Amino acid sequence: FGDDQRVIDGPGVIEERIEGIRYRISPNAFFQTNSYAAPMLLSTVREFAGDLSDKTLLDLYCGTGFFAVALAAQAKQTIGVELVPDAIKDARVNAELNSLTPSNSLGRLPTGKAPMNGGGISFHDAKTEEFNWMEINADVVILDPPRSGMHDKALADIIAAKPARIVYVSCNYKNFAREMVELSKYYDIEAMRAIDMFPHTPHVELVTALVRKD
């Protein structure tokens, strides 16, 4: 469609409200394609993430902050990472729309700032395979990669970081099966649920809860 974007009429963005959470979405930013099934996806990820009290949540491939913004109030700190700059801008706006105070550091709020709800939240414009999350010590990681799956280095880094729990949201079960060959060496499947986000197609959104082996 080209790189030039011009708003002919209206605000140039759309807004969705999922389970009471407000989301602003720009034209180039990713958001869940099925707004009617999105609440089921969100509630499943929330369930599979478990108790986030006093925990650090890392949301990789976070898009406009669909999961991160909704779960941040329950966690000690939340970090979202996404390649697309427009999506990260939206994610920061979405945090503010929902009474969260985003920071520019790894979950630490600017001096003098305090979150109105939950813990600190920050969003970072970066490739997942190039983002250094080792210093984060994430307890729970949400993975929602594109249909092409995860970069091999990102997968290796996640395994090396040793989060206690991973919630993997996959729209391509073939790539998920390939990645599970490696993940299954270190993680057990605790639960799995398929959500029909793409009616009348052969595709489903597969959500899997993985727990670190003892």
Describe the function of each predicted region.
Residues F1-P102, G120-L143, S148-A156:
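Accessory RNA-recognition modules of RNA-modification enzymes
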Residues L106-G120:
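Short Gly/Ser/Thr- and charged-rich N-terminal loops/segments
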Residues N98-T101, K113-N117, E182-L183:
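Short, conserved catalytic or adaptor-binding loops enriched in Gly and charged residues
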Residues P202-D214:
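Core SAM-dependent methyltransferase catalytic element
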Residues L109-P110, G149, V167, D214:
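Small/flexible residues
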Residues S122-V204:
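S-adenosylmethionine
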